[in-house]
Amino acid sequence: MKLAVFSAKSYDKHYFDATLRKHHPALCEITYHSFALSSETVSLAQDSDAVCVFVNDQLDAPVLETLYANGVRAILLRCAGFNNINLQVAEDLGFFVANVPSYSPEAVAEFAVALIQTLNRKTHRAFNRVREGNFNLEGFLGRTLYGKTVGVVGVGRIGLAFAKILHGFGCKLVAYDPFGGEEFKKYGEFVELGDLLAQSDVVSLHCPLTEGTRHVINDENLGRMKKGALLVNTSRGGLVNTKAVINALKSGQLGGVALDVYEEEGALFYNDHSGEIIHDDVLMRLMTFPNVLVCGHQAFFTEEALSEIAGVTLGNLEDFVLKRTCKNSLVREGHLVVPTDKEPVRL
C-alpha cells in the first residue's frame, strides 16, 4: 500500500512516521509532498493507492477523476472539514473517503479564548511596546469578560468545549445550532441567530463551511450584531465575508476581529511569504486595523492534536485496507454520510 501525503510539513512527517512505526509498521509506504494537491500536481499521485490531504488541498471533480484514473482508491482527510472535496463525485467514482472528525476540540477552543483575550486586552501590542521601553497603558483599555454575553455559532465538539471554558469565566452563553445539543443546555440557552448576534458581546464561530453557511457573516448579519462586539473565527474562512467585515470595522459597528482562518487562505497560509509582495489587497487592508488579529490557521496546532491526527488517519487507512467498517467514513456503502436534510453548522 502506497500513501501520498500532500501539503506535508516537517511536523506532519514526524508524527506520521512515529505513529506508523509504533502502531502500523506494515501498513503502508509513505511519500511526502510539501506542495498542495491540485490539478497541476495530481499526476504525482499516480503510483499511489491512497492520498492524504489537508484543508487547502483541492479535490474537485477533475482532480478526483484523475486520481481515480491513476489508480488511487482512498482519500484520507487529516482534518475535520470536507468543504474542499466534491463528495458527490467521490461517491460516484467509488472512493473511500474518511476524515478526522475530532482530533483536539479543546485545542481549538482554548485558542479561540486566547484570541478573545489577546484582542480584548491588547497583550500583543503591549508585548511590542514594552520591548521598546514604553510602559504607557494608553490604548490598552479592555473589558472584563465576566458577566458578558458570548454567542456560540455551532455547539459540536469544539463549540461545546469553548462554551465550557467561557462558562468558567462567568460569561452568559447563548448558542445557535439547528441540531440543538442537550449538553450545551447545562451552560447556556439556544436562541435564533438574529437574537444571538443582537445580544452578544463576543461572537465565536464553530461551524463547517457549506453552501448554507458560506458568508454567514455578511453585511446584513454584521448590521444585526451588537455595536462594538468582537468577532472570532477559528473554523473556516469562507464563513466570513471579509469585505463586509472591513466595512463594519471602518464604521465602528465591529469592536474587533480575530481570525485564525481566511476565505482566500489557500494561496498564503502554511507557507513563508515574508520575502515576497503579497497581492491580496483585501487581507492587507484588513491587517491595517489596530483592532484586528490574524493568525495562520494554527488553532489545532498542538502536540496532542498532531498525534491524534496521525493516529486516526492511519487507522482510517487500515480500515480501508482490511475492508472494515470505518466510523469516520464520509462515503459509506455507496452513500454519502453527510446530512442532507438540514445544513450542518457544527464541528
UniProtKB/Swiss-Prot annotation:
Main enzyme class: oxidoreductase
Molecular-function GO terms, alphabetical: D-lactate dehydrogenase activity; NAD binding
CDD domains assigned to the protein according to its UniProt record, in alphabetical order: LDH_like_2 (cd12183)
Organism of this sequence: Aspergillus oryzae (strain ATCC 42149 / RIB 40) (Yellow koji mold)
Keywords for this protein: NAD, Oxidoreductase
Record-given protein name: 2-hydroxyacid dehydrogenase A
Active site, per annotation: R236, E265
Superkingdom, taxonomy of origin: Eukaryota
Oxidoreductase keyword on record: yes
Catalytic activity, EC: 1.1.1.272
Binding, NAD(+): R157, I158, D177, T234, S235, R236, D260
SUPFAM superfamilies noted in UniProt: Formate/glycerate dehydrogenase catalytic domain-like, NAD(P)-binding Rossmann-fold domains
InterPro entries: D-isomer_2_OHA_DH_cat_dom (IPR006139), D-isomer_DH_CS (IPR029753), D-isomer_DH_CS1 (IPR029752), D-isomer_DH_NAD-bd (IPR006140), NAD(P)-bd_dom_sf (IPR036291)
Function: 2-hydroxyacid dehydrogenase that is capable to reduce pyruvate, hydroxypyruvate and glyoxylate in a NADPH- or NADH-dependent manner. In contrast to 2-HadhD/morA, does not recognize 4-methyl-2-oxopentanoate (MOA) as a substrate.
UniProt xrefs under Gene3D superfamilies: NAD(P)-binding Rossmann-like Domain
Catalytic reaction equation(s): a (2R)-2-hydroxycarboxylate + NADP(+) = a 2-oxocarboxylate + NADPH + H(+)
Family designation: Belongs to the D-isomer specific 2-hydroxyacid dehydrogenase family.
